[in-house]
Amino acid sequence: MRRVLAAVGLITMAGAGQAAGGHLERVLAAREIRVCIWPDYYGISYRNPKTQQLEGIDIDMARALARDLNVAVRFVDSSFAQLIGDVTQDRCDIAMFAIGITPQRSEKLHFTRPHLVSDIYAITTKSNRRIRTWDDIDKPGVVVAVAKGTLHEPIMRDKLRQATLLVTDTTQGREQEVESGRADVFMTDFPFSRRMLETTDWARLVAPAATYHLTPYAYAMQQGDSPWHERVEQFLADATRDGQLMAAIRRHKLDPIAAPTSASKN
């Protein structure tokens, strides 16, 4: 875990290139912060289909950031496939939906300190007899689905040796492939695996027996805007120190994947 977080520091520093800046000034002048979210991210930035209300840790933290800035918040629907374009083309001031810090994304985006760290998990069906344990996944004839643009796509492309990788255009597509039996498993993370177990009657979790691939999650913004990045980092430092961040993590049952830096040292 410490090695992962140490590597994050190098990646985020490398992401601080030159680009258009001035988001802090714009936010304060407009009295509004535009926050990109992925509204299907259970426990993170989820639009509840029953209420149509947004809920999750990063919804709570986005609203807290807006209060800290004394501005309104406007949520902008995005996705992992759209993430880089939405941020770099200024459709939002910041993306707040537990974004995995990867080398590919860090070439284009500037990340904050991580607040969550998740391993990779697999979802299969309760009726699938081929997949019983994690060791059954990378075998000849097994089809592993991942969603385009997610961090799981490059990771599984690199790690799989015998199984067939199926990349779907949407996250719903990977679920449909598994539920229909066309794929054996789809790869996801801790928050989304909870959604599958709590909201479907067919999903079964397959967890790695040991650490497989930890990824730190953070918020992302344009490169080259140091005042904005520093202001958000100050908010996160304050939210960590006063316990607000950890309270939000626990409220949404994400404490198993809380980053060590999310807990107050007081």
Q: What are these model-predicted stretches?
A:
Residues 81-85, 98-107, 155-158, 179-213:
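A ligand-binding cleft/hinge motif common to bilobed small-molecule-binding domains
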Residues 113, 125-142:
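Flexible hinge/capping segments at coil-to-helix
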Residues 116-124, 190, 194-237, 255-266:
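Periplasmic-binding protein-like
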